[in-house]
Amino acid sequence: MQEVIKAVNERGIPLRVGVNGGSLERPLLDKYGWPSPEALSESALNAVHALEDEGFTNMKVSLKASDVHHAIDAYYLFSTQSNYPLHIGITEAGTAMTGAVKSAIGLGWLLSHGIGDTLRVSLAADPVEEVKVGFEILKSLELRHRGINVIACPTCGRVEIDVVRMANELEKKLGHIKTPLNVSVLGCVVNGIGEGKEADIGIAGGEGKGILFKKGKLMRKVPMDELMDTLIQEVELLAEEKEAEAAGAPHNGSSSEQAEAGWELMGHTPDEQSTIVRDIPVLPSKS
């Protein structure tokens, strides 16, 4: 241990104390009977105290378990007993889909309660996907603001456009944009415009044509075969505007032609609009 401490001190780098439910010390397994959250927390505290006894404090701690509830409990318990930074993650989470879900639930709960300083999403997939999922978790909790956030409605009998294809295409074609923007792809105008109020820009399907809107305000009708290209162009222009505003520089403005505001554009009245109230549920920790 002294050699490790000497090496990291010479290089001025922190040390990560990593505790894993799959490799817990035998005495703690005998004491608790299984790799419980209490056992994980005690193991981490023992390691921290051993390093402190050597005069070393430049560290962060991780307590990983593949069970979401056990990981949450372990991190929460340790956070009540120590102030060291926490590297959070659900280890061996699973494949791209199941691992992303487990990580989103576990890391989302911890982060929403102020627990966690760095994170790792563990997937049996391309490591690039791990980074993408991690950023999406942070973006969903509004802890990081970078890139396009595509908001798309589920398919139903009212959809007038191929929402699934267009949403996926948007994520790929707008992946180069770093400016944080909410972009909506909504299948119809019945609920679409109301739901799109929280988006910076978006489109909704109509009868033989689509509509372009910004912040829930109708901008203009667009032929179906031009809808995707128009949205991509407008998103890129909006990103440029926001970047210029952030830099304090003038910009040329959007090429959108301001259409007459109101639902009359698509033959609907304002009272058909709807709004969404989004609540972030809190996952109770299982004891």
Summary of predicted features, one role per range:
Residues 17, 61, 110, 153, ...:
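Conserved, mostly hydrophobic/aromatic
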Residues 20-23, 28-178, 182:
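Catalytic alpha/beta core domains of metabolic enzymes, predominantly
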Residues 177-185, 201-287:
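Iron-sulfur (Fe-S) cluster-binding modules
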Residues 1, 96-99, 213-215:
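Short, charged, surface-exposed secondary-structure boundary motifs
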Residues 127, 156-160, 170, 189-199, ...:
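Conserved structured catalytic cores and adjacent interaction surfaces
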